Amino acid sequence: MSQTLSFVLKTHSVRKDFVHSVKRTLARRRDLQYLNNKLSRSMRAEACPSCASYDVCPNCTSGDIPDDGSSTMTIPSWEEITKTSTYSLLLSEDTSDELCPDDLVNVAAHIRKALSTQSHPANVEMCKEQLTSLLVMAEAMLPQRSRSMIPLHQQHQTARLEWREKFFSKPIDFLLERIGVSKDILQITAIWKIILEKACYCKSYGEEWFNIAKQKLREIKCFEGNTLKPLVGAFIDGLRLMTVDNPNPMAFLPKLIGLIKPLNLAMIIDNHENTTSGWIITLTAIMELYGITECTIDIITSLITTFYDKLAKATKFYSQVKALFMGFRSEDVANSFWYMAAAILCYLITGLIPNNGKFSKIKACLSGATTLVSGIIATQKLAAMFATWNSESIVNELSARTVAISELNNPTTTSDTDSVERLLELAKILHEEIKVHTLNPIMQSYNPILRNLMSTLDGVITSCNKRKAIARKRQVPVCYILTGPPGCGKTTAAQALAKKLSDQEPSVINLDVDHHDTYTGNEVCIIDEFDSSDKVDYANFVIGMVNSAPMVLNCDMLENKGKLFTSKYIIMTSNSETPVKPSSKRAGAFYRRVTIIDVTNPLVESHKRARPGTSVPRSCYKKNFSHLSLAKRGAECWCKEYVLDPKGLQHQTIKAPPPTFLNIDSLAQTMKQDFTLKNMAFEAEEGCSDHRYGFVCQQSEVETVRRLLNAIRVRLNATFTVCVGPEASNSVGCTAHVLTPDEPFNGKKFVVSRCNEASLSALEGNCVQSALGVCMSNKDLVHLCHFIRGKIVNDSVRLDELPANQHVVTVNSVFDLAWALRRHLSLTGQFQAIRAAYDVLTVPDKIPAMLRHWMDQTSFSDEHVVTQFVTPGGIVILESCGGARIWALGHNVIRAGGVTATPTGGCVRLMGLSAQTMPWCEIFRELFSLLAKIWSSVKVSTLVLTALGMYASRFRPKSEAKGKTKSKIGPYRGRGVALTDDEYDEWKEHNASRKLDLSVEDFLMLRHRAALGADDADAVKFRSWWNSRSKLADDYEDVTVIGKGGVKHERIRTSTLKAVDRGYDVSFAEESGPGTKFHKNAIGSVTDVCGEHKGYCVHMGHGVYASVAHVVKGDSFFLGERIFDLKTNGEFCCFRSTKILPSAAPFFSGKPTRDPWGSPVATEWKAKAYTTTSGKIVGCFATTSTETHPGDCGLPYIDDNGRVTGLHTGSGGPKTPSAKLVVPYVHIDMRTKAVTAQKYDVTKPDISYKGLICKQLDEIRIIPKGTRLHVSPAHTEDYEECSHQPASLGSGDPRCPKSLTAIVVDSLKPYCEKVEGPPHDILHRVQKMLIDHLSGFVPMNISSETSMLSAFHKLNHDTSCGPYLGGRKKDHMTNGEPDKTLLDLLSSKWKLATQGISLPHEYTIGLKDELRPVEKVAEGKRRMIWGCDVGVATVCAAAFKAVSDAITANHQYGPVQVGINMDSPSVEALYQRIKSAAKVYAVDYSKWDSTQSPRVSAASIDILRYFSDRSPIVDSAANTLKSPPVAIFNGVAVKVTSGLPSGMPLTSVINSLNHCLYVGCAIMQSLEARNIPVTWNLFSSFDVMTYGDDGVYMFPTMFASISDQIFGNLSAYGLKPTRVDKSIGAIEPIDPDSVVFLKRTITRTPQGIRGLLDRSSIIRQFYYIKGENSDDWKTPPKTIDPTSRGQQLWNACLYASQHGSEFYNKVYRLAVRAVEYEELHFEPPTYSSALEHYNSQFNGVEARSDQINMSDGTALHCDVFEV
């Protein structure tokens, strides 16, 4: 094997003549074979690109036609070949001897056959798969330019290209899966190239490619015993601990108990709950028990990351198991046991199932294993073989990745800078990964190969760095040209100037040579006589040098290709005063970049004039260059006298400024300043400002400060380097710069206030502050003194340089190592330490080597920590602070020395002087450091107290027994009591009918008490049951039942039991149940596996049901289907089912007011622990009058809005049936996706907007501005005589500068105040009365609308579409039908409504455009418009429009007057009702909408629901209208707590019902306050007419006598009752002959009973007219619709005719004037004509097309404005 390996790897070093000889010989012989037809063509049925490289291709199952050889003659055997001198010379380095051509042909034939077939002897030690891997390995170790010499290189490259074409478009998951399962190294290499190529171009393919590439490069598909060795090691350690270390187990037991603390642990586990808070409490208690709270808080992030790593490895397990069953080949093995043991051992060591190619070697090794001893020996041999295979697989994997990366290092593949940077990062990652394996002792034999791989990657990294440097912007150098006559000393001055600019030797460039391989890249570059040759384009060369763009030099040597010009200072010399002529095209660019110094030597010039022809003596030159005169020209001076013309025309027109004379020192300083200024403005110093500290002092103190800093460095054993000036040198850590005030510096500056060199002898405490007078924070000082740049490994150790030990750790186990390393690491580094510690388990003797590698890829914390590790392999000292330094000693030392002082910084004192010299950032950093210290001291206690608070306040209900034992057999006590057959039947029947579990003794005692006339509750109920049983004694029949259980004799009931019909005395006098269950359509039964009822559940919507835990415990079914996705939170739980009930109930966290049957609930609603027969249960105690029974658990308790707030879970039993235990509703997230879009997002934080608590929206909808109301052309001069004007227009309106937003906010604030309303019991009793009263003329079970479009067409299409769709409904209609946008919105809401799910109750807010009284305009009062969602309006119309129509159809007789026409005979019916009353009260209310109680509105909605068919549409509409409304305006959403939106569907009917309920409650409360029990229906005792907030109360004398208390109660409910005319004073009875209702005065006129419209309402119709929207309402509209305006004024005249001729004449004059000025086309009627027309319309003789018969109108034309 080693010989073949050497041959393959050394083929590339064979001489070229040998290669050519082999090729020529093979070609000649092949041609001869074809001519003689003795060599058949090599054929291979290939199915994939890699088939040619394998005996049995791992990718396909294609058959092979093997090649029989390449020689026409007989060739020597392989054994003979290996003995030839040619073969020996091939394996040696010496190839100078002549090689025999025939031997070379024979060797090539054998190698070719070994690579193409498996029948060759060379394959005995090495299969073809291994040969292919070796060739790929050879490719990886060689530079790319040398790989063409490797055998089959071109064939492998072609195969990889074809694989690339097949897999390039595949997703990343597919490629990673192929890498994990593929055994073809060519395919693996191609896949790696695809992944890395897309990672380099992640901008195009996605960042996930780059992230996954980095992650996978760090992972090697290997198996180094990480599974087997830790398990065996742990077993051995545990066995040693129990036997050798502690032979007495009994002595060890107390220690174990004391360590585990089982009692405390058991109590913690016993109180654990499977909830979020429960887990927090339990884990905190366990951490506190074992004292690991603090460290657990620090490493929780690492644990989460580890969990995800485990998940990522799940697919690998599947692949291995699949390969185990699919990859075996049948073998003839006699010793199957050892064969199986070998396969298992191979898997445990290598992590791979042995393939068929390796089975033969396993079989050969085990062929002699016939005894136990021989089997053990064979197993040992196999273990060594498997270890070698494992290492080979690792090297193959690394080789494939190296080849992929090296092939990507090509400008045609990675072309842009971003791809090069990413390729560089990937190459570094792979380089570090290979470096890891060089430290692995198992891989030591492969270190030469690994080093070659690293060398290849070093070449890639170097190439990428060069390519990056070419594209990177560089610092612009400074170029000075020394011009002057020859011999004046320019070149010598240039050399001296270079020494003053830099300590380095200057680089020299000669422009006469076209290549610059000699350029060294030093800071100073000298170009002597740069313009001496006319053949050189020196101008462009200089322009390229003095530029920020990289300049690539022309170099001939291969290793210098890509060399860049990097010098900072360029000094050039020239004999010409004008190096570039001003007329040149490049003159401007040239002179802008250079500075010219005119150099003259007066001594030399005077000598030449005085003694021409003689040599210049040395005395004319001085060492300090004082003999030279250096005159610096101005900018862009092309000669001494002139400056370049900016226009490039006349270059001798602009005079040059006078020169500046310098010496050699000032010239050097000027060049430094020019370089700093030139580059400071464009590019800040990169990456080092955080590690540079400047100490500013005076020039005379520089040396003293430098010595003080060096003393501080020695005193604190610091890592910083002291530098004088802003320039920094290489340093292990930070750099401390001693600066003068004028020097620029990029870093942190500190001003030295004092420096005393005497303090060098005693530097103690705060040495920096005491010695330098500098106030530095502790963080800055620790960073300055101990920061370590990068990771440094020190092999040579000096004890006096070692840092002081802070911690000394003896490493007995890997856990000691991991625990100590925790102090050095950041959060991400701690996870890396866990992985490193796990790896150390396998090689504990190599800890120094492992630490050396581990620190290369670990992130360390910023705290300074020094730890000494005492390991079996020696001493390791680790120092970390940002970076890390490590010292590894192969021997033990007593103490690692070092200075023990700890640096301390200055403390910021706000009242002291130290803070004056510190920037604000340092002061705030000191504050944050203080807060961090406080947090570090209280973080554990904070967590414990938080968990303790959760434990004290958490809700912990437990399951409750439901009155049955688990065997479903009651306790049969009292067996000694003898019962007759009738008594026994009576006892059984009593327990069955009343669902009790009484024993025989208890039953007999109860019957005895009832017979004696006891008045306790149980005796009374028994007597009631006995009477009912006696009446129904004949309703039973004896039957015989034949079933699966056999023949049984039973008694069955022949008639159905019916509830007792309760009269008014019971119904209206008190609240008692049971009655009909709430949310009946949303309640379902939960059964067991046998179908027996266990309890109830409530549908929440979308197949999610709520119940209690003990009902759904065990096997539970709903509608015959097993429930799933069960989630619990205490006793409250939720589950899913595919069976969906027709309706859903809304849930709310609050206090209930009704039990499941409608009875009132009295409760404090506080969760407490209660002792029951099943143990302690935590729930809320409640009291109701309804008796419950086992099996009622899960029924809902509701609040006044019908929302479920709790579920029934237990009762007090027969002794206290009124006591109930209720589980409050708690939120459980069961969402799978968003149900419907809504504006109000509860997950967003609350904000305060002008005093309103609201949610911010993503969309902003502004409040419409302007008005459509304009002054009529007839009244532009006298419009102020009208009592009304258009409402305030906002901040620009001089009548009231209040903005529209402020008006809306002020109007919404009352809606955000809580309104209690009437008492609960009073309200529900009055609700019953009103239902009973309405049921006399409103039918029951009115069907809801089932067609969505039919319901939509019942709406007013002139109104808003609501918050989800802009505009009005008619704007989204085509040919009378809704368009797609509107239809999609309606369909989405209708779909939810048909499932009984409530919809978002949201409105868009606007302001009503109307006429308002002048005084209200000045106050800025406007009425809000609530634009309801069109989807909600459609659903409500479908649910309640028919019920509403049934109520309004009887307005003449009922209390609700919605729908009445006040211009019809209906007013006469109202008049008759008013006249029949004893006392009449006309009442109006101020701010009616905002003072409505939600409980009263919910009661009114329940009244509508009562008369409906209870369909899911009805449930959805009712639950939606009961939910709190949300007002949307100006980009915010406000959820109001009270009030009734004016735009709510059916608002007039609901408002009228509210009005009736309020009045009824006030009357009942007033009567019962006077000890008058109300046992009758109040609405049968008095009459009331309501239309929204307008009301007329017709009280009998008894009610009138307490009217003050009635109106007082109304005020107590939150209402604001007032007189109709808004005058101040008590509400008193009015004259029945002039009642004002709906702005109409109902009175008798000569024509009969009429409703007279208010006169001011008629008159203002003539002053204002509707037109276009504008802010200028005083200007008449541009266009007037004569038809609409004429109809409006015609109606006004008709209404005015009812007030008499005098008033009509006034109106007539206004009408005539309006016709004249407005150019209308009608003639105002005379008084008699108007009177006749009105009476005709009143009596129905003449139809009115403009008549409004709607719930929100007042029987006026649509253009007649309301008050």
UniProtKB/Swiss-Prot annotation:
Family matches, as Gene3D superfamilies: 1.10.260.110, 1.20.960.20, 3.30.70.270, 6.10.250.3230, P-loop containing nucleotide triphosphate hydrolases
InterPro entries reported for this sequence: AAA+_ATPase, DNA/RNA_pol_sf, Helic/Pol/Pept_Calicivir-typ, Helicase_SF3_ssDNA/RNA_vir, Helicase_SF3_ssRNA_vir, P-loop_NTPase, Peptidase_C24, Peptidase_S1_PA
Q: Tell me if ATP-binding is a UniProt keyword of this record.
A: yes
Tell me where in this chain the PTM O-(5'-phospho-RNA)-tyrosine is found.
984
Q: Where is the SF3 helicase domain?
A: 458-614
Q: Which GO terms describe its molecular function?
A: ATP binding; ATP hydrolysis activity; cysteine-type endopeptidase activity; RNA binding; RNA helicase activity; RNA-directed RNA polymerase activity
For whether the record's keyword set contains Ribonucleoprotein, the answer is: no
Active-site positions on this chain: 1110, 1131, 1193
Q: Which UniProt keywords apply?
A: ATP-binding, Covalent protein-RNA linkage, Hydrolase, Nucleotide-binding, Nucleotidyltransferase, Phosphoprotein, Protease, RNA-directed RNA polymerase, Thiol protease, Transferase, Viral RNA replication
Residues annotated as domain RdRp catalytic: 1478-1603
Question: Can you tell me which residues bind ATP?
Answer: 484-491
Name it: Genome polyprotein
Q: Which organism was this protein described from? A: Feline calicivirus (FCV)
